[in-house]
Regions:
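A short, Lys/Arg-rich alpha-helix, primarily the initiator
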Residues: 1-11
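DNA major-groove recognition helix of helix-turn-helix
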Residues: 34, 44, 52
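Residues in the recognition helix of alpha-helical DNA-binding motifs
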Residues: 8, 22, 33, 62
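Short, charged recognition helix plus adjacent turn
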Residues: 11, 43, 50, 57-69
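Short alpha-helical DNA-recognition segment
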Residues: 13-32
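The alpha-helix within a helix-turn-helix
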Residues: 9, 20, 49
Length: 69
């Protein structure tokens, strides 16, 4: 889960549906990015950061704890 990305989206008043439309992708594709299942292409990553007005480098970090092997 990319908790920072989800937090920023919600704090800016977006649902996944409205945010995905704002950045030009499908809701399902955006959901996969937010859960960490997919990496956004560079152009989409830049649009996401621009719409959220966030320019830190940690927005796409996965924050799920790593389990033992």
């Amino acid at each position: 889960m990319r908790a920072k990305l989800q937090q920023l989206r919600k704090s800016n008043g977006y649902t996944q549906q409205t945010f995905s439309a704002a950045v030009g992708t499908s809701r399902s594709h955006y959901a996969q990015i937010e859960t960490g299942d997919k990496q956004p292409a560079l152009g989409l990553a830049l649009r996401i950061k621009r719409v959220l007005n966030y320019y830190g480098d940690d927005i796409f970090d996965n924050t799920m704890p790593v389990g033992r092997k």
